[in-house]
Amino acid sequence: MIEFDNLTYLHGKPQGTGLLKANPEDFVVVEDLGFEPDGEGEHILVRILKNGCNTRFVADALAKFLKIHAREVSFAGQKDKHAVTEQWLCARVPGKEMPDLSAFQLEGCQVLEYARHKRKLRLGALKGNAFTLVLREVSNRDDVEQRLIDICVKGVPNYFGAQRFGIGGSNLQGALRWAQTNTPVRDRNKRSFWLSAARSALFNQIVAERLKKADVNQVVDGDALQLAGRGSWFVATTEELVELQRRVNDKELMITAALPGSGEWGTQREALAFEQAAVAAETELQALLVREKVEAARRAMLLYPQQLSWNWWDDVTVEIRFWLPAGSFATSVVRELINTTGDYAHIAE
């Protein structure tokens, strides 16, 4: 299995180095749910600004303040502790009057707004995230500048970031041990983390192999294509390749790669043979996913950061802004820009 640091680059390995997250203010994330609170209902949506505390900690503190069980406070996604982040929490308070959340006190956390809502906010129920990153001590400004220009046109590999695999790859190692021993895993969180790491690693492997081809965005017979921003896909046939290639070049369609699991992967013929060969050596992880009934799915192979802009504060410091859809990783964008020092694994998804 290829480790994250050794995965194939779309724009070649960066020539320079730089520092990501010298301080929390260098990594700002603003959650985009894609909808507004209903203004009525038994739930309360609470938009918070936090710095130095993780999402679960804030959710538990909010539950205590509202005198409800911790399970009654939900969120769409975990946000990094060591960053400045805005996100929504959702508290279920049936039959209660609207509390004064301006009185909620927690170090490093501020309530920005809150309103009634009809539905629980579930994990993954967000449109995306807006990022503002500051890279410091950049050793090769010209290389980073050209890479930013290239990313605007060609995007970046849609890799799952190192944080998906745990510090030191612990989640993937857990999945491998589980696959090899077949010992039942009772802890639901471990099961979820390990299965997710296994499937994500196989996806990354397929994308890394595809990137080694001369033209990564060349449609081949049997490719599974999806409309940009949509989840469903269809299979490319030889008769349609010219027209489908035009639509891929126009970013109307995206070539996808497999998230292996039980059931059909979605590709056929040449594309299916390529994907199967790319992960042929990982029989244990594939068998684990099938055994645990994790359904196969598809994910876009490339990622195009939206609203990408940047500003050089000086020759060694650049501020970069962009928006990514839910499930994508800012660190996979940074990886194509600079060689960073430190481990990405501590950065929450």
Swiss-Prot record:
Keywords: Isomerase, tRNA processing. CDD domains: PseudoU_synth_EcTruD. One of its GO terms (molecular function) is tRNA pseudouridine(13) synthase activity. Pfam families: TruD (PF01142). It is an enzyme of class 5 (isomerase). Signal peptide: none annotated. It catalyses: uridine(13) in tRNA = pseudouridine(13) in tRNA. Substrate binds at F27, N129, F329. GO terms for cellular component: cytosol. GO terms for biological process: tRNA pseudouridine synthesis. Its EC number is 5.4.99.27. Residues 155-303 form the TRUD domain. The active site is at D80. It comes from the Bacteria. SUPFAM superfamilies: Pseudouridine synthase. Responsible for synthesis of pseudouridine from uracil-13 in transfer RNAs. NCBIfam families: PRK00984.1-4, tRNA_TruD_broad. HAMAP family: TruD (MF_01082). Belongs to the pseudouridine synthase TruD family. This is tRNA pseudouridine synthase D. It comes from Escherichia coli O157:H7. The gene is truD.
